[in-house]
Amino acid sequence: SAMMLSSAHALTVYTAGPGSLAKSLASGFEQQTGVKVTVFQATTGKVMARLEAEQANPQADVLISASWDTAEDLHQRGWLLPFASANADQVPANLKSADYIAQGVSALGIVWNSKSGTPEPKEWRDLTQPAFKDKVTTPDPALSGASLDLLIGLQNSMGGQAWQLFDELKKNGMVVSGPNAQAVTPVMQGAKAAVFGAVDYVSYGNIQQGESLKVIFPASGTVIAPRPMMILKTSQHPGEAKAFIDYVLSPEGQAKVADAWLMPARRDVAAKRPLLDALKVLPTTSEGSSERGAVLARFSQLYAQ
């Protein structure tokens, strides 16, 4: 739009949650550079839908997603501008590629309401116990790339037993909710007792605000969800976009990421929560999108019954 172009020094960032982190990074960058940042924050699904809808007149300069997959998809489509940040040295190799890099990392766990009157779960399969009958929610893998990753990770580590587990959870009354927040809210409010595969940082924030929740990472393993940042090739402000990514990866920017209860992408920035070395991380590499589609279809069919 003409309005946006009239301000030569405006940068538009489309980002998944948390909104408070996006605002904090935008204001920190603005203070440092004088570049005004416009933020559009929504779920990854909504952010991606908006990008698709704006193809004829692209608005976003920088995209921060909650799903590594979206970055790989846009890379394949040739939408991304290659960029190596000077601050990328401290970011592990598996969290960066030629045209996207992690802002931070979350992991999926069991989020349990400690006042629910249920025994504290330690393992995924504990949620199939009679104590958890009709008391478990899970985010919808059709709406959450990380939830689909968890299904794939468990299938990779457990083989056919993973599907036995999903079947037993279904028989025990597990409900497939919408995105992460919709799965966590009933557990926080006490209507349900536990979430199978919730995003950790959101619940750490809730705990800090006094909620009676606990985040549990099963020893058998879980999956991580690195949050990729990328610059769109259509950006009219590639210089400012690169400077923004440099800022997010600076010690100051990464401290803000840590304040949001995420794991920083940089190894040399302290976190307020367990880091990767405390987790058993399951591999989620699958044979591309067809495999993802097959796992999603099988799960959706199981839970539609």
Segments from the language model and where they lie:
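Early extracytoplasmic/lumenal segment of secretory-pathway proteins
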Residues: A10-D73
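A ligand-binding cleft/hinge motif common to bilobed small-molecule-binding domains
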Residues: D69-D73, A193-S212, A255
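A bilobed periplasmic-binding-protein/Venus flytrap-type ligand-binding module shared by bacterial periplasmic
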Residues: G109-S116, Q155, A225-H237, K256
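Extracellular/periplasmic bilobal clamshell ligand-binding domains
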Residues: R273-Q305
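Periplasmic-binding protein-like
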Residues: A93, S106, F166-K170, V176-S177, ...
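Short beta-strand-to-loop elements that line the ligand-binding cleft
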Residues: V37-T43, I64-S65, G173-P179, V215-F217
